Amino acid sequence: MPLIYMNITLAFAISLLGMLIYRSHLMSSLLCLEGMMLSLFIMSTLMALNTHSLLINIMPVVLLVFAACEAAVGLALLVSISNTYGLDHIHNLNLLQC
């Protein structure tokens, strides 16, 4: 495995570990998700460059669209939770409460 792939895989694993450790605050979770999406974007771009396939060339663009949607929804939730509760704890996102 080339060194660049190993570094990107390590970046994804560190972001995933951060997501598991810092899961109590929404802002920390969003930052870890963005790190995971960035490493997936770089990995898919490198794969598209190495395979020379026209079908896989659109994959990094689609991944960027999903990352932008995830960031927009996450920031909207963060603003809503911060305005309502004053904190960004994830346990405030429980939708089953009456």
Curated annotation (Swiss-Prot):
GO BP annotations of the record are: ATP synthesis coupled electron transport
Enumerate the InterPro entries for this protein: NADH_UbQ_OxRdtase_chain4L/K (IPR001133), NUOK/Mnh_C1-like (IPR039428)
The record's catalysed reaction(s) read:
a ubiquinone + NADH + 5 H(+)(in) = a ubiquinol + NAD(+) + 4 H(+)(out)
- Pfam families referenced in this protein's UniProt entry, alphabetically: Oxidored_q2 (PF00420)
Q: Which membrane topology describes this protein?
A: Multi-pass membrane protein
Q: Name one GO molecular function term.
A: NADH dehydrogenase (ubiquinone) activity
Q: What function does the entry list? A: Core subunit of the mitochondrial membrane respiratory chain NADH dehydrogenase (Complex I) which catalyzes electron transfer from NADH through the respiratory chain, using ubiquinone as an electron acceptor. Part of the enzyme membrane arm which is embedded in the lipid bilayer and involved in proton translocation.
Q: How does it assemble?
A: Core subunit of respiratory chain NADH dehydrogenase (Complex I) which is composed of 45 different subunits.
Q: What is this protein called?
A: NADH-ubiquinone oxidoreductase chain 4L
Query: What is the source species?
Result: Hylobates lar
